[in-house]
Regions:
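Signature of dsDNA virion morphogenesis modules
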Residues: 1-158
Length: 158
C-alpha cells in the first residue's frame, strides 16, 4: 500500500533585529564592579533560542534570541519578536528608537577577583530583555557595529 501525504507549509515574513546583549563594560553588582569577559571561550554559545523578555519579567516573553555570537568584545544577538499584539507594540517602539536598551540574565559558571573587581570568565546566557535602563550602558539595539541601526525582513519557512 502506497500512502501519500501532502503537507502545506506557510511562508511567513519575520523581522530580525541585531543588538548588543553585553560588553566588557564594568557593572556594579553588590558593591563591586563586575566584568563579563567576552570571547568564544567564556560564553556558552551553543544555547539555542534564548527567551526575550520584557524587563526581565519571566512571565512576559516577547520573543527569542535565535543566535548569539561574539563580535570583538561584544556579545551580539539576532532577535525575533513574537507575533502577539503586545510584543509587536514593543517591536514598533524598537523600530522608532523609543526602546533601545538590552540586558541579559546569566548564570556565572566561573569567576575570579582581581583588585576588587569580579571578572566572570565563564557564563551562560539565560535570557535577554528589552529594558528602560540597562546595567551595561553599551548594550542595546543598534550598538553591535558602527553603522546606523537598521532592521531587516527575512522570509523563511516554518
Amino acid at each position: 500500500m502506497n500512502d501519500e501525504h501532502t503537507f502545506l507549509m506557510e511562508v511567513r515574513s519575520a523581522e530580525f533585529f541585531e543588538g548588543t546583549l553585553a560588553t566588557e563594560t564594568p557593572v556594579e553588582r553588590y558593591g563591586q564592579d563586575e566584568v563579563l569577559l567576552i570571547s568564544p571561550k567564556t560564553v556558552e554559545l551553543h544555547t539555542k533560542d534564548v527567551p526575550l523578555l520584557d524587563n526581565h519579567n519571566q512571565g512576559r516573553q516577547i520573543g527569542i534570541v535565535e543566535q548569539i555570537t561574539v563580535v570583538g568584545k561584544k556579545l551580539v544577538g539576532r532577535i525575533r519578536f513574537a507575533t502577539d499584539r503586545y510584543s509587536q507594540e514593543i517591536m514598533e517602539d524598537v523600530k522608532e528608537g523609543i526602546r533601545q536598551n538590552l540586558s541579559i540574565g546569566y548564570k556565572v559558571l566561573n569567576s575570579f577577583i582581581e583588585n576588587g573587581t569580579v571578572f566572570v570568565d565563564k557564563f551562560k546566557v539565560l535570557e535577554a530583555s528589552v529594558v528602560p535602563i540597562p546595567a551595561d550602558q553599551n548594550a542595546g539595539f543598534g550598538r553591535s557595529n558602527d553603522s546606523n541601526y537598521s532592521f531587516r525582513t527575512i522570509n523563511f519557512n516554518y
